[in-house]
Amino acid sequence: TWELLLSKILPYIIVGYIQVIVSIIVGMAVFKMPFLGSKILFFVLTFFYVVANLSLGIMISTFSQNQMQALQLSIFLILPSVLLSGFVFPTEAMPSGFRYLGECIPITYYIRLSRQIILKGGGFEFVWKDTLALCVYIAVMFSSSIVMFKKRFVP
């Protein structure tokens, strides 16, 4: 079943990379955003973020009865993800409960490692903890998704 899950997400990995590349190009061209760190490191670590998000999507699909329910749950998760990730408000200024919730969201780690690599020129030694967190998130979500998928669809 992991082969089935992988075949389902591969096209979305490509789409995720296209979105990131377009965002970086627009940021650099239009907003004069500097890119101080390693582009190779950034794009390698972007893979983990894209896969983390896709693993969340797969988990949502295993819980959902239909496509509309999956879409509604995904939309329901977007706003808290953005607000708790440190994208809008600094996580240091959040109450500890909200900060803890933000640590359960993959975008939190991706924002930190993106800022470190792109804006500060940091290397892997500065982002390995965030990368590890994304890897743990992926492992937990994929494992849980496979278990849920088997319970639901495999007799």
Predicted regions and their residues:
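Hydrophobic transmembrane alpha-helices
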Residues: I13-I14, T46-V51, L73-S85, T91, ...
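Short cytosolic juxtamembrane segments of multi-pass membrane proteins
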Residues: V147-P155
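Alpha-helical transmembrane segments and their short interhelical loops
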Residues: T1-S74, L79, W128, F142-S143
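Membrane-interfacial helix-loop-helix junctions in multi-pass membrane proteins
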Residues: P34, G86-V140
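Short, functionally important structural connectors and interaction interfaces within domains
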Residues: V22-S23, G27, F63, S81, ...
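Aromatic side chains
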Residues: Y12, Y17, F31, Y49, ...
